[in-house]
């Protein structure tokens, strides 16, 4: 493999003038220590100084760069009442312990719920197709049964709830919701789509009218809140928005209409939820741009590797590791406990089978993985009534799933189909083994499994990155990947930056990183690997593609 230090050095040379906002009036803020006693970096000081002068900020905070602590320092220096918007409940609860008392720490959903509690109390739950059929009139249309129509209607309602649109109309006719819809001809297909749009619009109308008792989901009341044109500026003097790279259009619409000072923090290279409606907020937001590029999570070898990934996307600022943190890129073997990060749930199914005698933990639980395995097998055996997983429930047959995947190449479906095809009807034995593996709490596990999506915000000492990426299998040109698969690169970046100590790259990942280093004809140098580890029981971790 080529060395990547030269790539990082080149990025530094290209980014020499990034401190374009550093000519600020002195505010007697020294560079010694924060209020909590830790040393602030020059980048953190610039952010605090600019915020105190009242500027709207866009802070690009790389992985492990202390974004939350920077926001806390900003909050301590700002006067008036502030709002810290957290991405989820766990982040919000942690933030309450860190931010000063003049800053409210909330999620967008908690604000929206409080504003609408009187009209939605007792109605909020996860909906299913039977709720839709029970609450509004749903009829069969051509080959699409009531359940099929209700399923598409619910998907469209969810897409609308995350959008910035004012109503459900023909704008959504090209939505991903309808990718699998096929009539016998164009006229039938159009009629099916229009009928689903009509039914979704009807449900939304009825569930939002005064006195309605129809059930709604959590994202629905956030949408109701957005449509009410809320004025947060009446309550708050400044807003701190964390993890803004994963904001969806409905939340962005709320924030962009506020006139108070706004400080956005996030890492656009960690945007991995576009399939859920999130957009790259940095492209839509206004404000003075700053970087937090010094990571306090890992050392220089992992930061150099991560810099190669973001540089290939056009990022000119390198991610810098902390020199006195010892992190290594290893090969072949890994100390236990270690965490295996996978692109897909299907790869986790494969890997669980490789370690039958070990204490295992699956981040987020094993239920979703079992649901995927059971639903895939039910589809394979034409047991359609037992297809429960949302990703597979839309298909009427195994062949319909394969036809869809030939066009759209979903990573989970691709690998799941491969595994089931290999095992055939004996795949039911695989399901049994997954159900009866030795699962324990994370702190007791020898091996931890997680999808990269679920690893977001986490960190572990020893990390193995699996190579179950569609972009590896299809061997696309780098230019095509940068054009069509940018989020896959983001996932790789998220994964490699979860490691605090040792990182093991499986075969496909190593080959791909070599291609990235060669991209744009970077100077060919070599990554140095540390002597391979052995696991506690002497077993090696298989790096080859499964």
Each predicted region: which residue ranges?
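P-loop NTPase Walker
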Residues: 24-123, 307, 497
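Conserved helicase NTPase motor core
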Residues: 32-33, 39-48, 56, 194-279, ...
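ATP-hydrolysis module of ASCE/P-loop NTPase motor domains
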Residues: 120-203, 207, 386-407
